[in-house]
Structures are given as C-alpha cells and as structure tokens.
Amino acid sequence: MSNPMSEGIVVERQVSAARLNELGVHGWPTWKDGVGARRLEYDAVEKSYLLDGAATLTMSDGQTIDIEKGDLVIIPAGSCHWTVHRNVRRHYRSYALSPACCII
C-alpha cells in the first residue's frame, strides 16, 4: 500500500471491475478534457479513474508519470501539469488531507 502524500503520484494500472465497485468509482463525477496542456491546482488529494484517453502528469517537484485508459491515479495536493495526448474522460473524487483516505 502507498501513501501519495509522501510519495507523490500513485498509479494502479488496469483496475479490475471488482476494485472499481469497491471504491464506488462509477458514482464519482466525470471530467472531460481535450488534447493540450494545462496546469491544475489541487487543494486536496484526488483519486481519478481514466475511462478514456492518455496523458502525462508532472508534479511541481518534477515527478512525471504517463497514464491511460483503465488506470486509477492518486494525485497529491499541489500543482500538477497535465499534458493530454488523447482526449481524457475520467471519474474523480477529492479527499481531505488525511493519510487514511488515500491509501490504495
């Protein structure tokens, strides 16, 4: 198990349907974005599940990770630069900053 507040971005690749149901992902809001680059500010830790697309995420500390359809991503609070390579559609959920909320 990982704690993204101490390790940065955490990715669980190709998440199973059982895992998605366990987390209640399909009840989370949906966010869509087209190809391009933008910087997002996160006030709290966010979990995202990519329904479609591909992107590269870069945190302000320089950590970079590629994500794609089927990945569950935990993004720590702070500045994150999104470079979207293929249109992204994702479910997301923000959490208060407490270690227990964010363990994958």
For each predicted feature, which ranges?
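Well-ordered beta-strand positions
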Residues: 49, 66, 74, 83-84
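Short, surface-exposed secondary-structure edge patches
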Residues: 39, 47, 63-65
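N-terminal non-globular leader segments, chiefly Sec-dependent signal peptides
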Residues: 1-23
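Conserved short histidine dyad/triad with adjacent acidic residue
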Residues: 14-16, 24-43, 76-77
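Short, conserved beta-strand element in jelly-roll/cupin
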Residues: 42-57
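Short acidic-glycine-tyrosine-enriched beta hairpin
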Residues: 61-78
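Ligand-binding loop in jelly-roll beta-barrel domains
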Residues: 77-102
